[in-house]
Structure formats: C-alpha cells, structure tokens
A protein has these predicted regions:
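P-loop NTPase switch module centered on the Walker A-proximal segment
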Residues: 1-66, 106, 110
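Hydrophobic face of alpha-helices
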Residues: 49, 73, 108, 152-160
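A short, flexible beta-alpha/helix-coil linker loop
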Residues: 45-46, 97, 135-139
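Conserved C-terminal guanine-recognition region of P-loop GTPase G domains, centered on the G4
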Residues: 56, 61-124
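Conserved catalytic-core segments of large NTP-driven translation/proteostasis enzymes
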Residues: 115-174
Length: 174
C-alpha cells in the first residue's frame, strides 16, 4: 500500500526492511518555512562506519535520535563521537515517548552523561531536546508527550534554529 511505502521510504534495501535497521545512508528533502531541509538517514552501527562518515561529511547538523525506553546504545556513542569530531551541532530527539516503558527524563540524563564521558566541548552540550512519536509524526519541545494533534513542526523549527545554513556561493564553480 501507499502508506506502507511511505513508512519505509528511507529503508528501501531488502535487508534493511527485514532487519529493521539502516545500512545504507539515504537522503530526503522537506520544505519548511521557505527553507529546503535535506535529511540524511545514516546507519548507527560502527559496522557501517564508512556510510556514517560519508553522510556526516555532507551535513551541517545532526538529529541524535534515541529511543526513550532503551536509551543511548553503543551506536549512539559512535555516531556522536563522529559528529562532535566534525563540529556538528546536535538536536537530541527522544523518540517513542509513548511506549509504556519509556523513561525520557532518565534517558536524557544518560545522554548528558554520554556527552560528558566523551568530553564534548561545552558548546555542544547546549542542545535542544525534542520528544517524539515519530511513527505518528508527532513532536514537542523538551521532555514530554506530544499532543494527539501535534505535528513535526517543533522538530523542523529546531533544525532551522540550530543548524546553520551552508556557507558558499552557489554560482561559484565547483
């Protein structure tokens, strides 16, 4: 169905759909408030490190997506290390806050601890936090439960506020 296709557009590889993970980096674009935002979904696992590094070389910021029940996983640490090394600003997204076992406040503390463990420069620790139920397209600022009629507007607004536009002259030769 069309709905199933839309749900899995970023997981187009058969193995990705079967395993429920991202293996190959993929891009999508969305227009928001007159700005074209390019999103790149990367694998999180160090096993696919080449894909992560290629994707991070093309972006100006990261959405650090963390399950509100599971908390940061080893791949969270790996991707965060690479993003900080590239001096990319992060927006922390606590996803699946609607799960019965969600513990968003504790998970956010674990994320702060991860930033501290990695000895991240202070300017990276001042990140916006978004709570989300991504599969339903709902988000809100801070730690909380998005309203039933919420949209992804808070997430897209955070991207516009946090991630600087690319610098360069589009008319200049490559």
């Amino acid at each position: 169905t069309h709905e199933a296709l839309v749900d899995r557009v970023m997981d187009s590889n058969d193995q990705e759909r079967e395993r429920g993970i991202t293996i190959l980096a993929k891009a999508a674009s969305v227009h928001w408030k007159g700005v074209k935002i390019n999103l790149v979904d990367t694998p999180g696992h160090a096993d696919f490190g080449g894909e992560v590094e290629r994707a991070l070389a093309m972006v100006d910021g990261v959405l650090l997506l963390v399950d509100a029940a599971e908390g940061p996983l080893p791949q969270t640490r790996y991707v965060l290390q690479k993003a900080v090394a590239a001096d990319l600003p992060a927006i922390v997204v606590l996803n699946k806050v609607d799960r019965a076992d969600a513990r968003p406040e504790e998970v956010l503390d674990e994320i702060y601890q991860l930033f501290m463990d990695l000895e991240v420069p202070d300017h990276h620790i001042e990140f916006p936090v978004i709570s989300a139920v991504a599969r339903e397209g709902r988000a809100c600022e801070g730690v909380g439960m998005p309203a039933p009629d919420a949209t992804l507007a808070p997430l897209l607004d955070a991207v516009l506020k946090t991630v600087l536009a690319p610098i360069g002259d589009p008319a200049a030769p490559l």
